[in-house]
Structures are given as structure tokens and as C-alpha cells.
């Protein structure tokens, strides 16, 4: 004991090392102290006495060696990685069979051999009870007061022979867990660690190691060896030394079958998602349209899909229910394979998004009709499978939301759809304009398309339908012309150009006569009338022109109807086709913008048909025409029926320029224009006064007297006797006198023209020869007599405005020729042709272009009738 004083530091060091080698025992001692008091502490000190004695007796060299070889101290274990099969539960490690688990070892002096000092046992640490204490002997040690030897170490858990160190305070070891025995669901294992102590030499003289973990002798001389001499396995006294091995997790299905099911479910998920988009995007209206106007393949597809698509809510519920069921099952199977919830969620999300949503929806959005038709049997199958759940829900949706109608486009949407799809459809611009115009017909009013009143061509009701007025109407190009009285806004009648078909401009008929006769109704419409309603009115046939008016209630006074303009059927049609209708008479492309037609030639000029002032036909009453005709036929021998037929005479009197007028000028009474005849000036015409007064100056004495109506002069000018005749021989007579002098009275019954037949060709000389027997009083008439001129020896001057008959020699001779043709027996066609040709030649002088054209046309008609009569030499 004394000698031990010098070794006190070594003893203390050895005692400290011993204490470090037994951490679990120290912790047990502390718990015993707090639980049982000082008695327990004294018992623990008594058990440490041999160790203290051993430390005191050790040599200085031995103590130094023990200090250099420190014992490994294991404090506890933790799982390095946790998952669904390896985790901490209630302070115990829970792992699965047939797995390898990495454990982190915490302690002191962790080295490469630490893995060999760890083991597990199946036997739980034995706990002593108070009944086990001896009655007469010394008290047994407390259950928790010191280390306890482990039971049999298990071979179900194998410590793999390697370790990963970290600063000698921790390291990672790996253990392999064998399968559980049959019928075992789980099994508990407990941690054991190894302790090794040096054995003392015999006789006490040997030097032995005093540290835990050294290899020494069997014990100290005179003392029994400790129970953990050599290598001893004891229970680890920590709280996390229990390991529970559970049964290996089994898959719901075999792995290969589970992979097949996952692939199939992924395909079904994509199919449900694609059909949901593809079929539900095909509304019933679109399917009906495709059935009627699609291609043959599209019609077949739509016919197969339409019965299923008609049950919209039922189809929707079936597809959604199937999609949700498939996606849920897919996630469960992936979780079973992956073994981790997070991994299953990530993998299932990626798979469903890519292969179950994006790809199928991208395909079905473009080819939904074909995909839906080719998979219709699968759709019907799943509708039957989900019938118990989806059908009631669909009926509930039908009751709440109503029956599905489909996409219906209004006018604006339809127009916009046509505009947007214009690059992709086969509509040409004109077709698109017509469709657009027809759809916009109900949105526009007549005020938008009407012609304003200021731009309308109108005619006053006081107008006279003479050549100028009718030419103006024809040049306007309009077929319906409003007629107004007073102001232009006071439209009272409507004139159709076809009403003027039987109106002669020479008749100067008042416009009111025509409008009252036809009495076309006026059609008034209000300015807010829609174009579709206006079109329906025009289609009824009442009128193709309407007068636009509005109620003017501005200012003071009563409201009144104000005429704004006119609208026609052409305006409505132009609005429908979105284009201007240009005919040959239009001057403007648009009656609102007043843009003129670029290619339009000059307007038609009717001035070529207008008579000059000298050619203006004088109008006489039918009664005066009859009296004039009877007077000439009975009183003037040259116009008697024996010389000229009454029919030809009537045509002659109706011929232009036969009846003329002369305006008397009071300021210039002696003007040459006032003389009908002047002495010693040759003339070739006959004059019959119809109205007015004339002064006749005759003879060398210059006798003057006045004459009035139905006095006639110049009969000899028609026959042109070779010598001038005196006044007595020119029979200046009154109304009751008969012209006898100078007339061919000797031969009142001239012979009929001989040698005339259908093949005769009458030249001018032939006609003169044919008429010669009627113009002389003897059988020896000279054709040269026609070349003579008549020179009167009197003057006839107007005293007032005159209206008279003036027949030239040429007109008279042509009338005689026509009379002879009329008396000649021949076909009616030839007769009419010859008479017309003869009367056409009654103009003085050479024929103009119009006369030549008419002669040529008559000749063509005559040749077609196989007649050879020509008009050569017509003057």
C-alpha cells in the first residue's frame, strides 16, 4: 500500500482509463446513486477496490504503456440513411430483412478495428428482481450497476469488415441483414460490444497492461480474474441499442407484371386525356356540319362519333372518372415499386404530364375526329364500365346545366370566323364579300345606301316630251325617273322610260298626260328601314324604286315628312355583293362618292336625230289635214284621183317639210324671207295657204290684192311648161275657182304605165318617160320639158304669220310614180317596197347619209323578196 504512494499518479491514471473503458458501468452507477442512495455507491466502490490495488502495484513502465494504448469507447449508433424500410421508431432502429444498412458509430478512439468490437444478439438483457437477493449472504449487484455479459451473438446480422473513419470520433460501418425465419414477421436484436483486460503475471512480479482492451494474463495474483477477462461481450447500456428487423416489403404484383400494368395505365391515361379534349371539342353542331359537307372519310368519322357525343355529360363523366382512376392506380403502383413516396410522386407526375397529357392532347387537338372514331369502341366500353358512377352524375348535370346545344355563331362571330380563316379556306374574295354583305344586310338601313335627293335625276311635272326632253331622259341612263312639282322634295309621280315607247317627240306630249295614264304608285319608306326588309318589299314586285323619307320634328311647328333621297333594288344588290354594278349608261362607280367611271366613253349624243329649225314639222289638227286633203283632191286637177291616188296624197301631205310656217316680221316687211314667190325668179314648188294672209302683186300694172286660206299658187311649177305663162294662165284663183289654165285638161285619163312588171328596173330617166303622157295635152310630149323651170310673173308676200303647204316638183313626181305603182297589180310586199322607195325620194337635192342608209336597207329587204327594183338616181 505504501509503495503505492509513489505510484499514485499512475494509479489515478489507470483508474481513469478503467473508468473510460467502462462508460456504461459509470452511467449505471450514476443512475444507481440517484435511485438507491449511498449504499449502492459504497457497493460499487467495493467492487472497484481490486482494480485500484492493481493500479497501485503496477510498475511505472507498465503505466506508461497503458497510457499509450487507449481503449475504444462506443457511445451509440445511428442510421446513416433513412427510407421507408430503414428508420428510427421509438428509439429503436427498424430495418428490413435482406437489406444492407449503413450505421454511424459514435465514440472515442474509433479506429479501423472498431467494426470487430460490435455484434448483435437475439437475447434481451436480463433484468434482476428484488426476490433474487440472498437472505444470509452478501447482496448481489444491482441490475444496472455494472456491465452484463451478452448472450449468444446472432449470425443473422453480419458486420462487414470495413469502416469509414471521421476524426476518430465516428465512423460508418455497413451491416447485412439476413432473411427472417419462416413465420416470423419481425425480430429484435440488441447491441453488444467487446471488452478485453490484461492478465497479471504469476507471483505478482510480472508487468501487465492496466488498460481495457489490452491482452494480458489470466488475472492478478491472489485475486480472482474479472468476468470479462480476455475478450468479453457485454450489452451496450445506451438507449438506442435495439434493432428491429421487419419482414421484407412485398410488391402487390410480380415486378414484371407490375411494369406492364404501369405502361398500360400510362397509355390509358393518355387516351382518356386525349379523348376528353378531342371528343368534347367536337360539339354536336360541328359533327352535323361535317356529316353533311365533309369528305367521305370525315362523314364516316362524324357518323360514328355523333351518337356518343350527343350524350355529352355522360361521356364527360366517364372519361374523367376513367382518367382519375387510371392516374391514381398508376401512382400506387409506382409507389410500390419505388419504395419512396417522394420518388413515386415525382415519377408519376413526369410520366402523366408528358405521356398522359401533353402528347395525347397535342395529337387529339389536331386529329380529334380520326382518333375519336378509331377508339370509339374503347370509349363505349369504359362508358359501360363506369355506368354506375358516371350516369347518375351526368343526369344531375343535365338537370342543373341543361341539355348541351353546341357552339352557335351569331352574325358578328360568323363574319369574324370567315375573316380569320380566310388564309386557310378556299373562298375567293368575291365570295367572301357576298357572304359578308348578306350577313350585314340586317345591320344597315336604307339611309346608308340611298342616293341623296340632290344627286337624283328628276324631271318636273310641267315638262313637255319633245325631242330635247326625251334626249335628256335617254342620256341620263335611268329607267325610273321621279317627277316633282314645285320643289324637288315634292315627288308626285314616277316615269318609266318604257312608258315613252309610243310617244313621238314631234307630238310634244305633256308629261302629265303620260304619268296620269300609267299612274305608277309611289313607294315611300322611312330612313331607318333595314335593307333586308327593303329587299323583301322589292321582291314583292310593287316597285324597284322607293322614296326615302323621315319625320322632321325639328324647330317649331308640326312634324312633317322630309324626303331624303331614293333607294333602288340595284342599291340593295350592290350592298349585298359589296361591289358596284356598272351598266353602259353609268357615269359614276358610286353614287355617294361620285367617283367617275374611268373607262367610260363619251355619253351618247342624240343630236344627229334632232331636226333643225328649218326641218321642224308643223303640227296641224286632224280636221285641217282632212280639209286640206279633200280640197286638193277635188279642187286642184294636179292632185285629183285621176292623177294621184288619195292614199298617196295623204302620205305626201304628212311628209316632213310639206307643211311649213312663216313668221312675219313687222320691222322687215320687204325681207326676202317674207316672199313666197318673186317675179321673174324661177321656182319649182306649189304653195297652198292654210292660215294667214298674203299679198299678190301681178301684171305690169302691179295690181295688188290680198288672199287668205286655201288660195294656191304655182301649179305650173309642178308640170314646168316650156314657156312662162301669164297670170291668167297661172290661174290665180280664189277658194271657189277651179284651176284650168295650163293644166293637162285634154288628156284627163292618162294611160296606165305600160311595160312595168316585177323585173323592171326604173331609172330616173325611165320614170320621167313613164310620167310624160300625163303632163302634156298632145301625144308628142318632150321629156326635155322637165328640164324647164317655172318663172312666175307675180309676187306673193306674207302679211301675217303663215301656215302653208309647199310641195316641190320632185315630191310631186315621186308621188305620181307611187300612185302608178299602187295601181299596178303586183304582190303586196313589192307594192309597199316600191311605194316606200318612191316616197323616200321626195326630198329636194341629193340624199343625205340617213336617206342613203334607209335606201340601202330597203334595197336589201327588196332583194330578199326577190324583187329587182333599185333606187338608183334617187334625188
From Swiss-Prot:
InterPro entries (UniProt xref): ACDP, CBS_dom, CBS_dom_sf, CNNM, Ion_transp-like_CBS, RmlC-like_jellyroll
Domain CBS: 450-511, 518-584
UniProt subcellular location: Cell membrane
Glycan attachment positions: 112
Membrane topology category: Multi-pass membrane protein
Note: Shares weak sequence similarity with the cyclin family, hence its name. However, it has no cyclin-like function in vivo.
PANTHER family to which the protein is assigned, alphabetical: METAL TRANSPORTER CNNM, METAL TRANSPORTER CNNM2
Role according to the record: Divalent metal cation transporter. Mediates transport of divalent metal cations in an order of Mg(2+) > Co(2+) > Mn(2+) > Sr(2+) > Ba(2+) > Cu(2+) > Fe(2+).
Family: Belongs to the ACDP family.
Protein name stated in the entry: Metal transporter CNNM2
Provenance organism: Rattus norvegicus (Rat)
Organism classification: Eukaryota, Metazoa, Chordata, Craniata, Vertebrata
Gene transcribed to yield this protein: Cnnm2
Amino acid at each position: 500500500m505504501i509503495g503505492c504512494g509513489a505510484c499514485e499518479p499512475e494509479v489515478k491514471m489507470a483508474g481513469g482509463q478503467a473508468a473510460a473503458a467502462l462508460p456504461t458501468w459509470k452511467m449505471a452507477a450514476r443512475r444507481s446513486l440517484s435511485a438507491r442512495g449511498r449504499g449502492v455507491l459504497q457497493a460499487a466502490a467495493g467492487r472497484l477496490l481490486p482494480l485500484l490495488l492493481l493500479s497501485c502495484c503496477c510498475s511505472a513502465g507498465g503505466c506508461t504503456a497503458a497510457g499509450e494504448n487507449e481503449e475504444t469507447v462506443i457511445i451509440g449508433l445511428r442510421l446513416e440513411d433513412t427510407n421507408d424500410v430503414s428508420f428510427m421508431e421509438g428509439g429503436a432502429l427498424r430495418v428490413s430483412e435482406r437489406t444492407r444498412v449503413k450505421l454511424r458509430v459514435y465514440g472515442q478512439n474509433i479506429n479501423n478495428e472498431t467494426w470487430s468490437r460490435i455484434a448483435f444478439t437475439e437475447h434481451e438483457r436480463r433484468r434482476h428482481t428484488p426476490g433474487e437477493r440472498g437472505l444470509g449472504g452478501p447482496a448481489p449487484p444491482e441490475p444496472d450497476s455494472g456491465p452484463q455479459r451478452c448472450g449468444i451473438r446472432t449470425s443473422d446480422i453480419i458486420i462487414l469488415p470495413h469502416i469509414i473513419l471521421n476524426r476518430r470520433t465516428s465512423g460508418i460501418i455497413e451491416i447485412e441483414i439476413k432473411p427472417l425465419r419462416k413465420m416470423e414477421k419481425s425480430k429484435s436484436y440488441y447491441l453488444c460490444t467487446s471488452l478485453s483486460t490484461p492478465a497479471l503475471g504469476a507471483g505478482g512480479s510480472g508487468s501487465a497492461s492496466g488498460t481495457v482492451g489490452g491482452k494480458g494474463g489470466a488475472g492478478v495474483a491472489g485475486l480472482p480474474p474479472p468476468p470479462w477477462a480476455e475478450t468479453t461481450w457485454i450489452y451496450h447500456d445506451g438507449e438506442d441499442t435495439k434493432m428491429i428487423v421487419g419482414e421484407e416489403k412485398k410488391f402487390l404484383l410480380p415486378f414484371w407484371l407490375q411494369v406492364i400494368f404501369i405502361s398500360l395505365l400510362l397509355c390509358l391515361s393518355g387516351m382518356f386525356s386525349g379523348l376528353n379534349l378531342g371528343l368534347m371539342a367536337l360539339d354536336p353542331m360541328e359533327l352535323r356540319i361535317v356529316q353533311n359537307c365533309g369528305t367521305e372519310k370525315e362523314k364516316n368519322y362524324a357518323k360514328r362519333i355523333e351518337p356518343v357525343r350527343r350524350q355529352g355529360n355522360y361521356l364527360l363523366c366517364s372519361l374523367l372518372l376513367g382518367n382519375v382512376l387510371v392516374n391514381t392506380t398508376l401512382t400506387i403502383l409506382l409507389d410500390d415499386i419505388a419504395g419512396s413516396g417522394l420518388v413515386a410522386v415525382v415519377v408519376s407526375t413526369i410520366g402523366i404530364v408528358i405521356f398522359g397529357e401533353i402528347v395525347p392532347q397535342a395529337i387529339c387537338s389536331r386529329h380529334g375526329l380520326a382518333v375519336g372514331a378509331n377508339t370509339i369502341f374503347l370509349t363505349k366500353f369504359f362508358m359501360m364500365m363506369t355506368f354506375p358512377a358516371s350516369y347518375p352524375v351526368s343526369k344531375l348535370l343535365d338537370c342543373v346545366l341543361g341539355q348541351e346545344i353546341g357552339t352557335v355563331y351569331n352574325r358578328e362571330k360568323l363574319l369574324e370566323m370567315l375573316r380569320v380563316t380566310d388564309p386557310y379556306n378556299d373562298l375567293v374574295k368575291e365570295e367572301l364579300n357576298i357572304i359578308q354583305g348578306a350577313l350585314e344586310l340586317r345591320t344597315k338601313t336604307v339611309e346608308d345606301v340611298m342616293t341623296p335627293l340632290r344627286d337624283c335625276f328628276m324631271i318636273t311635272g310641267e315638262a313637255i316630251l319633245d325631242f330635247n326632253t326625251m334626249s335628256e331622259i335617254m342620256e341620263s341612263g335611268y329607267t325610273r325617273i321621279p317627277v316633282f312639282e314645285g320643289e324637288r322634295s315634292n315627288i308626285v309621280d314616277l316615269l318609266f322610260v318604257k312608258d315613252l315607247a309610243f310617244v313621238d317627240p314631234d307630238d310634244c306630249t305633256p308629261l302629265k298626260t303620260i304619268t296620269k295614264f300609267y299612274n305608277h304608285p309611289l313607294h315611300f319608306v322611312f330612313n331607318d328601314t333595314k335593307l333586308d326588309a327593303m329587299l323583301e318589299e322589292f321582291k314583292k314586285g310593287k316597285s324597284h324604286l322607293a322614296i326615302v323619307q323621315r319625320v322632321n320634328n325639328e324647330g317649331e311647328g308640326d312634324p312633317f315628312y322630309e324626303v331624303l333621297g331614293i333607294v333602288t333594288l340595284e342599291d340593295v344588290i350592290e350592298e349585298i355583293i359589296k361591289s358596284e354594278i356598272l351598266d353602259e349608261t353609268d357615269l359614276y362607280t358610286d353614287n355617294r362618292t361620285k367617283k367617275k367611271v374611268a373607262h367610260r366613253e363619251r355619253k351618247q349624243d342624240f343630236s344627229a336625230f334632232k331636226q333643225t329649225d328649218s326641218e321642224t314639222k308643223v303640227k296641224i289638227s286632224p280636221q285641217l289635214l282632212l280639209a286640206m286633203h279633200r280640197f286638193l283632191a277635188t279642187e286642184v286637177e294636179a292632185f285629183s284621183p285621176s292623177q294621184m291616188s288619195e292614199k298617196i296624197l295623204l302620205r305626201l301631205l304628212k311628209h316632213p317639210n310639206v307643211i311649213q310656217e312663216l313668221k312675219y316680221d313687222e320691222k322687215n316687211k320687204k325681207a326676202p324671207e317674207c316672199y313666197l314667190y318673186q317675179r321673174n325668179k324661177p321656182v319649182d314648188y306649189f304653195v297652198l295657204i292654210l292660215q294667214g294672209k298674203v299679198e299678190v302683186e301681178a301684171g305690169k300694172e302691179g295690181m295688188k290684192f290680198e288672199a287668205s286660206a286655201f288660195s294656191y299658187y304655182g301649179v305650173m311649177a309642178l308640170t314646168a311648161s316650156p314657156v312662162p305663162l301669164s297670170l291668167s294662165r297661172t290661174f290665180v284663183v280664189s277658194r271657189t275657182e277651179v284651176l284650168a289654165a295650163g293644166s293637162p285638161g285634154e288628156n284627163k285619163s292618162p294611160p296606165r304605165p305600160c311595160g312595168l312588171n316585177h323585173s323592171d328596173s326604173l331609172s330616173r330617166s325611165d320614170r320621167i318617160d313613164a310620167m310624160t303622157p300625163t303632163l302634156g295635152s298632145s301625144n308628142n310630149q318632150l321629156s326635155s320639158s322637165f328640164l324647164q323651170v317655172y318663172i312666175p310673173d307675180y309676187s306673193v308676200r306674207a302679211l301675217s304669220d303663215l301656215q302653208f303647204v309647199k310641195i316641190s316638183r320632185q315630191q310631186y313626181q315621186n308621188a305620181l310614180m307611187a300612185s302608178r305603182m299602187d295601181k299596178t297589180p303586183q304582190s303586196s310586199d313589192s307594192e309597199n317596197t316600191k311605194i316606200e322607195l318612191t316616197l323616200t325620194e321626195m326630198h329636194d337635192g341629193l340624199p343625205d347619209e340617213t336617206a342613203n342608209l334607209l335606201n340601202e336597207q330597203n334595197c336589201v329587204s327588196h332583194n330578199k323578196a326577190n324583187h329587182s327594183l333599185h333606187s338608183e338616181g334617187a334625188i
